[in-house]
């Protein structure tokens, strides 16, 4: 598996780090854009990458401003800058990959940015796997205990020097405002394909409230999946293989429909 990293400019000229993985010998049919969540960065999902590459994906993961290896103030420009950075990255991918299909896996904070991206760029008919979306309040702190249920997962997070233990108050307020606006007028999701995945013990996303909200969205055949005992990062938990398999299964099913 090949792994490279580089930088790309967002629409305002800020340099954002991204990395990508691919199997050049096996080849790939699709590109998965992985958008990190609260407390995380582009390298926070080590189990997801090989599973997607084995399924003939190229995986591209950016660091939002101030997170991971991206320089600058954490969350500079707010959710709007994140959404526009996703568009800039998609254009960069298209220039390199041509007609290969792009799909998005968006976690937590990244899910709010991805939904705003779809609203701002309605011509994009990209399918979206939404994981633990922060739609009902945004915390400032992101402790390992909030993200993880099992001890190994907690230790991996606490040992990560790029773990973002907190975000600025202004970013939290902006994310919260954006989430409320997205839920108040979800018409931009009319006919789109999205699936929602959440841990049943997530302290930040009440899954029953999320299920009710998803049921009101004008999506085409929405999917809602919960995972017992998982917290805010179900991708990295003990049942991460089942979570990732659920992503891949949904993408395959909806590709054919």
Name every feature range the model reports, one short phrase each.
Residues 1-23:
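N-terminal cap/lid segment of alpha/beta-hydrolase-fold proteins
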Residues 38-41, 67-99:
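Catalytic nucleophile-loop/oxyanion-hole region of alpha/beta-hydrolase
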Residues 39-47, 59:
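Serine-hydrolase catalytic-loop signature spanning alpha/beta hydrolases and amidase-signature enzymes
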Residues 49-73:
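Conserved alpha/beta-hydrolase
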Residues 101-127:
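Conserved hydrolase catalytic core segment
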Residues 196-198, 202:
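Short beta-strand/loop motif that positions the catalytic acidic residue
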Residues 206-215:
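Short alpha-helix in the alpha/beta-hydrolase fold that links the catalytic acid
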Residues 223-257:
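Catalytic active-site module of serine/aspartate enzymes centered on a nucleophile-bearing elbow/loop
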